[in-house]
């Protein structure tokens, strides 16, 4: 019979147990001890060594708080994905400098956990100074609608420059790549798009796409 826990307390205990095993496995491996190969634990070694972040799927405020608490307990790098009820605990997220990917916002509440899905969290984050990025959770919402999401957030009252950063610089920061991409600065990769107008307007087209200084796309006018 499946004896997996059906409560949030039980799920948190499972996560903590897995991380504790990974912590012990990593310590023994680094000490050169003879250990039995475990592919699941091996996948967590880079997480325990802070080489990679652990991505936490969370919608509800209580789940977000639990995720932050457990990650801090083990001293992990982490990112929070979805963060639907983040607007309820803005100060807590800001205090912990948590990296958040908010969304998909252009989607109905498909379950109890995300029934509060709308643009309250991005607006609250923007006003409080939380540097978050948007996610469409492709293929829930197609990735091409990312800039549309940012544009709608502006219509709700989000600062336009912050909305643009939420799909560029802050997205790069979320992936740990802001030293290379996300903004036009000396020393970064020459990756950018030339738009026909405001990139946050759905009527705007991408005219030219440049990757590492090379033009890889030019729009043909029909």
Regions inferred by a protein language model and the residue ranges of each:
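A general structural motif
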Residues: 36-37, 56-60, 81-84, 111-119
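Short aromatic-centered micro-motifs
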Residues: 209
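Short acidic active-site motifs
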Residues: 43, 88-89, 121, 182
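Polyanionic/metal-chelating signatures
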Residues: 1-78
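Active-site-adjacent beta->alpha loops and helix N-cap segments on the catalytic face
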Residues: 85-95
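His/Asp/Glu-enriched, well-ordered alpha-helical/loop segment
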Residues: 53, 94, 103-107, 111-197, ...
């Amino acid at each position: 019979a499946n004896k997996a826990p059906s409560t949030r307390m039980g799920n948190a205990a499972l996560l903590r147990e897995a991380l504790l095993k990974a912590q012990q496995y990593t310590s023994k491996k680094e000490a050169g001890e003879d250990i039995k190969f475990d592919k699941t634990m091996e996948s967590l070694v880079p997480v325990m060594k802070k080489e990679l972040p652990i991505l936490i799927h969370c919608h509800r405020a209580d789940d977000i708080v639990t995720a932050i608490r457990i990650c801090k307990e083990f001293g992990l790098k982490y990112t929070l994905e979805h963060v639907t009820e983040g607007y309820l605990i803005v100060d807590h997220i800001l205090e912990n400098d948590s990296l958040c990917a908010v969304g998909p916002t252009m989607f109905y509440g498909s379950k109890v956990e995300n029934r509060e899905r709308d643009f309250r969290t991005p607006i609250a984050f923007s006003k409080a100074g939380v540097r978050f990025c948007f996610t469409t959770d492709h293929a829930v919402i197609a990735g091409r609608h990312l800039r549309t999401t940012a544009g709608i957030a502006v219509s709700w009252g989000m600062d336009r420059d912050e909305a643009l950063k939420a799909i560029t610089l802050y997205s790069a920061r979320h992936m740990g790549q802001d030293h290379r991409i996300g903004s036009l600065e000396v020393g970064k990769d020459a990756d950018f798009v030339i738009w026909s107008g405001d990139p946050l307007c759905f009527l705007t087209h991408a005219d030219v796409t440049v990757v590492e200084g090379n033009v890889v796309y030019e729009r043909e006018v029909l």
